[in-house]
Amino acid sequence: MKPNEKNTWQLAQPVLLNLFREEEERWRHDPTTVLPAFKRELLDAGFEFELLHQSLNYLPACIDVVLPIAVKYFCLSTSINEKQYIRNWFSFRGCTLAVPPLLHEIEENMDKPSWCWELGDTLLRIRDESHAEEYLAIVKDKRYGIGRQNLVLLLGRIKYAPALPILIELLNDQEAALQAMTAISCFKSPDHIRYLEPFLSSHDPDYRKQAEKAIARIRKAAK
């Protein structure tokens, strides 16, 4: 299989190629890494590339073939750094096979809010509506801290109505209030403007700006 030519410029620069070669050379000295096996399985599946990162050029066109392989090695890896890298292969709309392991990873890493934030970002890109209850359960749990932010946005993006009472509550949560404003505006209901208006006079410019944007979005949809 040939890669998507329009994406190959990203890896054509010699400096970038050398960096990726050096990285793959380091794999030889790490017996715990799953990345060589991941690369081998993609090559065995018929993809043509020199460096693992170049296989991203096949996406999203060949996602049906790549997704099960990528999810397999995401689950096998014991390294957060590796998992951060592997999730690049399924950060696309519709990669629903990746959702359960991503959610499991969040639940196992409650004490790592930045990592949970990144996992939530991947879930936001995938946008699978069938796990809305699980997203909401995480969003409701303040122990995840900022790790909830992208799932708050996701609940708005998929317009999950049962989440609305929680989203309104989150307007008083400093770790998720800005995202809650955006999520509430996704429902485009004029009835929700009253929850956002108090923030127009906030001392925090970020709150004022986000409230203005959210209200404007609702009013535009109502016209």
Task: List where the protein language model places each region.
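Short intrinsically disordered terminal tails
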Residues: 1, 222-223
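Core helices of alpha-solenoid repeat scaffolds
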Residues: 31, 35, 66-67, 99, ...
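Terminal targeting and flexible regions in eukaryotic proteins, enriched
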Residues: 1-15
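Structural detector for internal amphipathic alpha-helices that build alpha-solenoid repeat scaffolds
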Residues: 11-29, 40-62, 72-76, 81-95, ...
